[in-house]
A protein has these predicted regions:
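Short acidic, hydrophobic short linear motifs in intrinsically disordered regions
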Residues: 43-56
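Short amphipathic alpha-helical interaction segments
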Residues: 56-72
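A short, conserved structural fragment
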Residues: 70-83
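Short, amphipathic alpha-helical interaction segments positioned at domain boundaries
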Residues: 95-129
C-alpha cells in the first residue's frame, strides 16, 4: 500500500518535527545537518563514503563531519576493505543511531512523549529559549490530535 500526501497530512506527522529535531540535537549533541544526514543514511541501510559525500551536498560544509560521526559512534563499518577483492569499505548507521531515529519516529507518531524529567538536558529551565521549548513540549503532550 502506497501512502499519499493526504495520508501523511492526516497523520500530522510533521506538526512537531522542529521541536522533536531540536530535542534530539540538544540531547545527543548533534547539529541539525548531522541529524538529517544520519536519517538519510539510515534510509539507505548500507552506504559507502561516496554515498555519504553525495548526501552532504545539501548541508552546510563541515570537513570533519565524517570523522566526528564515526568517532562518536553514529556510523559503524559494516564490511572492511581488503585491498585486493574489496576495493572500499561499506558502512551502516550504528545501533545507537538507529535507536535514536526510531525514537524520533515514535515521538512523531505520538507513541511516545518527549521526556520532561529534570534529568533531561532539553527540559532544564536555564534560558528563555529553554522555557519556550518547555512550553511547546507541554502543549505537544496535551495535544490530542497529534
Amino acid at each position: 500500500m502506497k501512502l499519499s500526501a493526504i495520508d501523511i497530512r492526516d497523520l500530522n506527522l510533521l506538526k512537531y518535527y522542529r521541536l522533536i529535531r531540536k530535542w534530539a540535537c540538544k540531547t545527543y549533541s548533534l547539529n541539525d545537518a548531522d541529524l538529517e544526514l544520519l536519517i538519510y543514511l539510515d534510509c539507505k541501510k548500507r552506504f559507502t563514503r561516496n554515498d555519504f559525500i553525495d548526501g552532504t551536498y545539501t548541508y552546510s560544509w563541515d570537513k570533519n563531519r565524517w570523522e566526528r560521526l564515526r568517532k562518536q559512534g553514529w556510523i559503524d563499518v559494516w564490511r572492511h576493505r581488503n585491498r585486493t577483492t574489496i576495493k572500499y569499505s561499506i558502512y551502516k548507521t550504528s545501533f545507537k543511531c538507529s535507536q535514536l531515529i526510531s525514537r524520533i519516529y515514535r515521538i512523531m507518531l505520538a507513541e511516545e512523549d518527549l521526556p520532561t524529567s529534570e534529568r533531561s538536558k532539553f527540559y532544564k529551565n536555564k534560558s528563555y529559549t529553554d522555557k519556550v521549548y518547555n512550553k511547546a513540549i507541554d502543549d505537544m503532550i496535551k495535544d490530542k490530535d497529534r
